[in-house]
Amino acid sequence: MAEITAKLVKELREKSGAGVMDAKKALVETDGDLDKAIELLREKGMAKAAKKADRVAAEGLTGVYVDGNVAAVIEVNAETDFVAKNDQFVTLVNETAKVIAEGRPSNNEEALALTMPSGETLEQAFVTATATIGEKISFRRFALVEKTDEQHFGAYQHNGGRIGVITVVEGGDDALAKQVSMHVAAMKPTVLSYTELDAQFVHDELAQLNHKIEQDNESRAMVNKPALPFLKYGSKAQLTDEVIAQAEEDIKAELAAEGKPEKIWDKIVPGKMDRFMLDNTKVDQEYTLLAQVYIMDDSKTVEAYLESVNAKAVAFVRFEVGEGIEKASNDFEAEVAATMAAALEK
């Protein structure tokens, strides 16, 4: 039987990522054949990964990588936040983001077939990681964003990598693009412009806003405060030319009723129209980047601020770890019972 030296164990660990005992056992089982030991560890890793396949992995990290005029944002999941801080896990995330940015796959199937620095496919690398780390490690999603030579990427990660953002800005510079990405990370817009909002979605969100106003008015009535008006509109998409023209006419009629001289209306109407637009685009302000108040200058929307510096936002992607994943709530008694049952089966 071949001698299993510490040097051989170390070499296998470096190539496979396996622990000391697993590496030594694999070498013993394969009579010191390094290649066979690697294959054996891979097979065992696939078996371990299969056992963990039905677990919920809702923690993890985002990865962001820029490759020239292409940027990738990815999400990789683990079962616990503790593992998400593991050096091996962090390296896997960073390598995956780089491989995807450079490989430019069109879907997850193509992404999983890409070759990692280890020589494994991306899919195999995640099986290996699941086996060596001891938790289900899964590649969840990615997005690729492209720009022209004249445009700028803003790459930003927040909260230790739990949020990853790429923004494309035309005009300005990389620093401005990064500031916009910081805004996106903080304010959670879902689309760039109101033109991307579904009409039914706007209708439903407006109903929710008015329901909240109704509840607020009940509280206000109890302390003899005047009721707040309900909102007629929620998005710029609903503000047709006719609606805007009627709003302006209503404002002028109000000024006339108040006895304001007509010669000063031109100074008053624009401000009141701005207020009308602000009050009737609440859904846009919640969900669209361009309509949100800019965190770097709260006197302007993102769109207005960028216009003031001869720039505009073209696109963005924002990933937050665990979005849309339902985390399992463990029943402690059931967990203990399952552990005991598993022990009895052995």
From Swiss-Prot:
The keyword Protein biosynthesis is annotated on this UniProt entry: yes
Protein keywords: Cytoplasm, Elongation factor, Protein biosynthesis
Gene: tsf
Its job: Associates with the EF-Tu.GDP complex and induces the exchange of GDP to GTP. It remains bound to the aminoacyl-tRNA.EF-Tu.GTP complex up to the GTP hydrolysis stage on the ribosome.
Membership in a protein family: Belongs to the EF-Ts family.
Transmembrane spans: none
GO MF annotation list: translation elongation factor activity
Cellular location(s): Cytoplasm
GO CC, alphabetical: cytoplasm
Protein name (record): Elongation factor Ts
Pfam families with a match to the protein in the record: EF_TS (PF00889)
SUPFAM superfamilies linked: Elongation factor Ts (EF-Ts), dimerisation domain, UBA-like
Domain of life: Bacteria
Region (Involved in Mg(2+) ion dislocation from EF-Tu): 80-83
